[in-house]
Amino acid sequence: MALLDLTVQMACSDRLPDLPWQDWLDRWLTDIQPQLPEDWQAPTYEACLRFVDDAEIQQLNRDYRQLDKPTDVLAFAALEDELALGFDPEEPLYLGDVIISVPTAQRQAQGHALETELVWLSAHGLLHLLGWDHPNEEQLAAMLTQQERWLQLVAVPVPPRWLDEVSQPPSSEP
């Protein structure tokens, strides 16, 4: 039985390859579940992975982050709300939504496949749903390292531009 019940939504006109999103995100969640806080432990989880165009992600970015421009990935974590309301341990714990802009991912996929970029961004989004953030260089390096590990776990090459960032030690500058 899968640990994660994933809903994948295609809300863009771009044709995307059929990738095993359910399997990959389930494997990533299975990998990291032992590290989750005790009150985030559940027998199963739910999440949504939505692929959109730049207009939709720009609207979301404007509405929720007050940034009126497209971005590559947004994550709307539900765990804090779910835990505050209490949850039935017999029911799946809803993690939230990961929204990825396919056109922005395509622009970023210079020197590697769009599929690789989309997998990289989905790993990043899932980490945000699980409480990870990157307000400083050290936490960004930890997050990028985890993303690299997850891509290796599902045999997807790490985007070349990220390899440089992962291998760089965190800056000591403020």
Swiss-Prot record:
<feature type="binding site">
    <location>
        <position position="124"/>
    </location>
    <ligand>
        <name>Zn(2+)</name>
    </ligand>
</feature>
<dbReference type="GO" id="GO:0008270">
    <property type="term" value="F:zinc ion binding"/>
</dbReference>
<comment type="function">
    <text>Single strand-specific metallo-endoribonuclease involved in late-stage 70S ribosome quality control and in maturation of the 3' terminus of the 16S rRNA.</text>
</comment>
<keyword id="KW-0479">Metal-binding</keyword>
<keyword id="KW-0540">Nuclease</keyword>
<dbReference type="GO" id="GO:0005737">
    <property type="term" value="C:cytoplasm"/>
</dbReference>
<dbReference type="GO" id="GO:0006364">
    <property type="term" value="P:rRNA processing"/>
</dbReference>
<keyword id="KW-0378">Hydrolase</keyword>
<dbReference type="InterPro" id="IPR020549">
    <property type="entry name" value="YbeY_CS"/>
</dbReference>
<keyword id="KW-0963">Cytoplasm</keyword>
<keyword id="KW-0698">rRNA processing</keyword>
<keyword id="KW-0255">Endonuclease</keyword>
<keyword id="KW-0862">Zinc</keyword>
<dbReference type="GO" id="GO:0004521">
    <property type="term" value="F:RNA endonuclease activity"/>
</dbReference>
<comment type="similarity">
    <text>Belongs to the endoribonuclease YbeY family.</text>
</comment>
<dbReference type="GO" id="GO:0004222">
    <property type="term" value="F:metalloendopeptidase activity"/>
</dbReference>
<feature type="binding site">
    <location>
        <position position="128"/>
    </location>
    <ligand>
        <name>Zn(2+)</name>
    </ligand>
</feature>
<dbReference type="InterPro" id="IPR023091">
    <property type="entry name" value="MetalPrtase_cat_dom_sf_prd"/>
</dbReference>
<protein>
    <recommendedName>
        <fullName>Endoribonuclease YbeY</fullName>
        <ecNumber>3.1.-.-</ecNumber>
    </recommendedName>
</protein>
<feature type="binding site">
    <location>
        <position position="134"/>
    </location>
    <ligand>
        <name>Zn(2+)</name>
    </ligand>
</feature>
<dbReference type="Pfam" id="PF02130">
    <property type="entry name" value="YbeY"/>
</dbReference>
<keyword id="KW-0690">Ribosome biogenesis</keyword>
<dbReference type="InterPro" id="IPR002036">
    <property type="entry name" value="YbeY"/>
</dbReference>
